[in-house]
């Protein structure tokens, strides 16, 4: 298959950044297709740490074209700040190697403020958003009142579009007892940003179609994880976009038949940030040990991640909803030294055994994991680059994961460094 889609197979933070960076060496184009600057990637290249939030990981590789698709919500200031920060680290970024869909929805200060107001209003209604305006921006997109990048090229019609947007937002603010936003201030800000943003604007669907017809390889980079999908995730503790693999087509303008091989990324254990159900969560010393070893803190927020054993039920479910062809298993080295390792193979719900996570919030909270115990290993897996480097028991663990989720392991990651990767099946050649 000429193209590859990379998606998180859990709740995000699975190590997609490293895998995308590793695969991007074989790709011509790396395209983001959903989310915003709420989901960060940390990449370690030759000892240098790079933190990305909005930009595709492909920007770190010279000669690759990076693309931000229409399915993304785009914060102009966050974009400019990230470009500036990476430029200071020696990364060359310009309209020559980075294009942004002209019809991408913009995140404005009013979106960030509304997000924070909702999240901080009550602990009872908090779902753990990053308060970066992602959800409110998607709401405006669906409500057909969003400001898009292309609108900055037509300053004459922009005031009308801002007024349409404020008809909604100022009504909300009046209800909250807050002062209203002024259209003139927003117009001034967007007018000032336009010359810095418009050089990146592109008709992305057309660009990608041309490149596809030329035989170029496209790598579609997802953010977050499939269990945060607004339809297929643990609703309402989800993000505001579709994070499953099918969104790669919708979020870039490519046809579904053009997406190609679907590679799911999952950790050898499970983590989650924020609120929501987590059947295998370990609120004990083992969970803290995994978190410390794995340095489980959010790239963007710094929030500690909740940690637990590998949940084969959830990953198997994601394999189905995303149509995953192969998995990349990351952070196997974090499990080094455990005498035994637990893997969730099913759930008990109200006295009955089930093989999937139910859609209802109440039922999700009541499921109890059924565990299978697997013998651990003492020898290190860290920095392994071939199957021969792995302890026999670690190989057995990987093989058992394959059996339980019904999907082969295509890649195995044993450290944050891009070279510490074991290739089983090349997604671009599958």
Curated annotation (Swiss-Prot):
Signal sequence extent? none
Species, as recorded: Rhodopseudomonas palustris (strain BisB5)
Q: Where along this sequence does the record place binding of IMP?
A: 13-16, 38-41, 130, 144, 224, 239, 303
Family from the record: Belongs to the adenylosuccinate synthetase family.
SMART domains from the xrefs?
Answer: Adenylsucc_synt
Reaction catalysed by this chain?
A: IMP + L-aspartate + GTP = N(6)-(1,2-dicarboxyethyl)-AMP + GDP + phosphate + 2 H(+)
- Lineage of the source organism? Bacteria, Pseudomonadati, Pseudomonadota, Alphaproteobacteria, Hyphomicrobiales
Q: What is this protein called in UniProt? A: Adenylosuccinate synthetase
Under Enzyme Commission nomenclature, its number is 6.3.4.4
């Amino acid at each position: 298959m000429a193209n590859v889609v990379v998606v998180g197979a859990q709740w995000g933070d699975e190590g997609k950044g490293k895998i995308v960076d590793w695969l991007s060496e074989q790709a011509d184009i790396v395209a983001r297709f959903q989310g915003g600057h709420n989901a960060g990637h940390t990449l370690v290249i030759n000892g240098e740490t790079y933190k990305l939030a909005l930009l595709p990981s492909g920007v770190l590789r010279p000669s690759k074209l990076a693309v931000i698709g229409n399915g993304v919500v785009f914060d102009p200031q966050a974009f400019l700040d990230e470009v500036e920060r990476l430029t200071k680290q020696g990364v060359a970024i310009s309209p020559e190697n980075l294009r942004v869909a002209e019809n991408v929805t913009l995140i404005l200060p009013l979106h960030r403020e509304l997000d924070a107001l909702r999240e901080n209003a009550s602990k009872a209604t908090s779902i753990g958003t990053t308060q970066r305006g992602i959800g409110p921006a998607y709401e405006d997109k669906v409500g057909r009142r969003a400001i898009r990048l292309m609108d900055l090229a037509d300053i004459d019609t922009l005031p009308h579009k801002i007024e349409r947007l404020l008809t909604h937002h100022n009504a909300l603010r009046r209800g909250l007892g807050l002062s209203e936003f002024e259209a003139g201030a927003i117009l001034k800000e967007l007018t000032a940003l336009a010359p810095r943003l418009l050089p990146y604007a592109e008709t992305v669907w057309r660009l990608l179609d041309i490149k596809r017809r030329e035989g170029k390889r496209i790598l579609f980079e997802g953010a977050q994880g499939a269990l945060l999908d607004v339809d297929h995730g643990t609703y309402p503790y989800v993000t505001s976009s579709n994070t499953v693999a099918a969104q790669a087509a919708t979020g870039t303008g490519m046809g579904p038949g053009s997406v190609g091989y679907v590679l799911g990324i999952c950790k050898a254990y499970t983590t989650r940030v924020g609120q929501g159900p987590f059947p295998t969560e370990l609120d004990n010393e083992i969970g803290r040990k995994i978190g410390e070893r794995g340095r489980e803190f959010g790239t963007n927020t710094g929030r500690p991640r909740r940690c637990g054993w590998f949940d084969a039920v959830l990953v198997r479910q994601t394999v189905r909803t995303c149509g995953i062809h192969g998995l990349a298993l990351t952070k196997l080295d974090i499990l080094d030294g455990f005498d035994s390792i637990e893997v969730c193979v099913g759930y008990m719900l109200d006295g009955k055994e089930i093989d999937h996570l139910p859609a209802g919030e109440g039922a999700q909270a009541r499921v109890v994991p059924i565990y299978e115990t697997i013998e651990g290993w003492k020898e290190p897996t860290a920095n392994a680059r071939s199957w021969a480097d792995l302890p026999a028991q670690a190989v057995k663990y990987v093989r058992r994961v394959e059996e339980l989720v019904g999907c082969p392991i295509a890649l195995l990651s044993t450290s944050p460094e891009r070279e510490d990767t074991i290739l089983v099946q090349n997604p671009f050649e599958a």
